[in-house]
Amino acid sequence: MGHFSSMFNGLARSFSIKKVKNNNGNCDAKEAADEMASEAKKKELILKSSGYVNVQGSNNLASLFSKRGEKGVNQDCALVWEGFGCQEDMIFCGIFDGHGPWGHYVAKQVRNSMPLSLLCNWQKILAQATLEPELDLEGSNKKISRFDIWKQSYLKTCATVDQELEHHRKIDSYYSGTTALTIVRQGEVIYVANVGDSRAVLAMESDEGSLVAVQLTLDFKPNLPQEKERIIGCKGRVFCLDDEPGVHRVWQPDAETPGLAMSRAFGDYCIKEYGLVSVPEVTQRHISTKDHFIILASDGIWDVISNQEAIEIVSSTAERPKAAKRLVEQAVRAWKKKRRGYSMDDMSVVCLFLHSSSSSSLSQHHHAMTILK
């Protein structure tokens, strides 16, 4: 229980928890956890209004930029939420890449609902783990760890968000969906959750002093062995069109639809029973002094820019707030050279800097929210 004390104490400063005593005089974990989750829900309007800045911009801690492609409305959106969950050492970042007729609405809906849902689930599971240190969430005999808490929180959140999206009265997600690539930084640890084919890349300093790119996520494409096996096992099909060699897509068993170029996504209920899932891959990394920054970007960037090129572009940008925009601009130029004749995709980038510059720190930017619509 000791290794959870600092986390729980931090929450206690932000959320008033009345611990209920049972007949034995012990704290009832379930009631305390339920109350914590209830408190979070009550604060939803506060979290969306006063104390948070809704702007299209960047600062010395994070840089955001999004550019519409040549296929119509920009279906990408992004979010950086500093002071996530009223915790000074936490930040939430996300890239959401929509697709289909309602893709831009789906992406915004997931962006708007995921952070708060994640926060509620995290608080509830954290309270249970703190008050019941032997709690076993994954069928093992091990005590639950911080990573287990975040993983279970993400799994519950993604399942809930996808279910709510399916029953949304104003958004038709049957043939539309979105990816979701998110990061939570908590102190000196980052937790990465990925649904879809957006990508997170870390810039790490090598022993020789140069920056090297470390890919933190998998691009969940239908031709990945484990993804293809699942899809075929659910009677879905995976193949490329004649005019798109190398672009594997997911198809219904008896129809030439929907042709989805990813194996995980929110929405797209026309193909969910045939192997598409919204289950995130969740990983963690302990931040070292050699870890400089993380780039989150939609697939439009990675179609024309390599991981190494991306970190070199960002690291060579003199001013941090301009880093995301410069990377997008370089990707636009690369697209025109490498993919001439193809309509340019939407391009969105979040750059999260892991160490403060002389004029920036997490505490100085506490409670700022940056949104790109």
From Swiss-Prot:
Under Gene Ontology molecular function, one entry of this record is: protein serine/threonine phosphatase activity
Q: Name one GO cellular component term.
A: plasma membrane
Give the enzyme's EC designation: 3.1.3.16
Q: Which residues form the PPM-type phosphatase domain?
A: 61-354
Record keywords, A-Z: Hydrolase, Magnesium, Manganese, Metal-binding, Protein phosphatase
User: Its catalytic activity?
Assistant: O-phospho-L-seryl-[protein] + H2O = L-seryl-[protein] + phosphate; O-phospho-L-threonyl-[protein] + H2O = L-threonyl-[protein] + phosphate
Per UniProt, where does Mn(2+) 1 bind?
A: 97-98
Entry keyword annotation includes Manganese? yes
* GO biological processes: drought recovery; microtubule cytoskeleton organization; negative regulation of growth; protein dephosphorylation
**Claim: Amino-acid biosynthesis is one of the keywords in the record:** no
Superkingdom of the organism of origin: Eukaryota
Cofactor(s) needed for function: Mg(2+); Mn(2+)
Instruction: Give the cofactor binding note.
Output: Binds 2 magnesium or manganese ions per subunit.
Where Mn(2+) 2 binds, per the record, is at: 97, 299, 345
The enzyme class is hydrolase
Q: List the InterPro entries.
A: PP2C, PPM-type-like_dom_sf, PPM-type_phosphatase-like_dom
Sequence similarity: Belongs to the PP2C family.
**Stated name of the protein:** Probable protein phosphatase 2C 73
Look up and give the organism this protein is from.
Answer: Arabidopsis thaliana (Mouse-ear cress)
